[in-house]
Amino acid sequence: MESRIIEIDPNCVNEFEKLKKKYKIESIFLKLNDNFNLLYVEKTLSKISQDDFLESIPVDQPRLIIYKKYSNNKIIFIRWIPEIVQDTIEYSYSNASTAILELLIGINEYMEVKDLIQLSNL
């Protein structure tokens, strides 16, 4: 499969820098556009419970999520790819995660997740 070039919206890095500097942001949801060539910030969340965080994750659509765990001050990069996602879409998100991780300095942990149960102990 041919590798696609993924463009990263600058707001992805800007929001990450805010999260690192202890602004009110606790998580950043990144999504690819319909052409799978642009990664952008879908939404940011702050001051929410873990249950609300888990409920905000789409059960049938992939996302790249940056989550700040304030209890130990770790920043976790989560590649959420539900089991039902087509291989071509999973491949696009894999390329996007590689591209964005090159720009994000300060990620402490990386998780590949296919089942929300894996996130229940964040």
UniProtKB/Swiss-Prot annotation:
Q: Which family does it belong to?
A: Belongs to the actin-binding proteins ADF family.
Tell me the InterPro entries matching this sequence: ADF-H, ADF-H/Gelsolin-like_dom_sf
What is the organism field in this record? Dictyostelium discoideum (Social amoeba)
Q: What does this protein do?
A: Controls actin polymerization and depolymerization.
Q: What Gene3D superfamilies does the record tag this protein with?
A: Severin (3.40.20.10)
Which keywords appear in this protein's UniProt record, sorted alphabetically? Actin-binding, Cytoplasm, Cytoskeleton
PROSITE patterns referenced in this protein's UniProt entry, alphabetically: ADF_H
Boundaries of each ADF-H domain copy?
3-122
S-adenosyl-L-methionine found in the keyword field: no
Membrane-crossing residue ranges in chain numbering: none
Q: List GO molecular-function terms, semicolon-separated.
A: actin filament binding
The chain's coiled-coil residues are: none
Q: What Gene Ontology cellular-component terms does the record carry?
A: actin cytoskeleton; cytoplasm
Q: What is this protein called?
A: Cofilin-5
Pfam families listed in its UniProt record: Cofilin_ADF (PF00241)
Localization per record: Cytoplasm, Cytoskeleton
Q: Please classify the protein's predominant subcellular localization into one broad category.
A: cytoplasm
- Example GO biological process: actin filament depolymerization
Keyword Transit peptide recorded: no
